[in-house]
Amino acid sequence: FLSLIPGAISAIASLFK
């Protein structure tokens, strides 16, 4: 589960860019 968080943050960060 913890390894899944970075991927989610990356996707969300790309949306804000």
Curated annotation (Swiss-Prot):
It comes from the Eukaryota. The keyword Secreted applies. Expressed by the venom gland. Keywords: Amidation, Antimicrobial, Antiviral protein, Secreted. It is found in: Secreted. One of its GO terms (biological process) is regulation of defense response to virus. GO terms for cellular component: extracellular region. Inhibits hepatitis B virus replication in the HepG2.2.15 cell line by about 40%. This is Peptide Ctry2801. It comes from Chaerilus tryznai. The lineage of its organism: Eukaryota, Metazoa, Ecdysozoa, Arthropoda, Chelicerata.
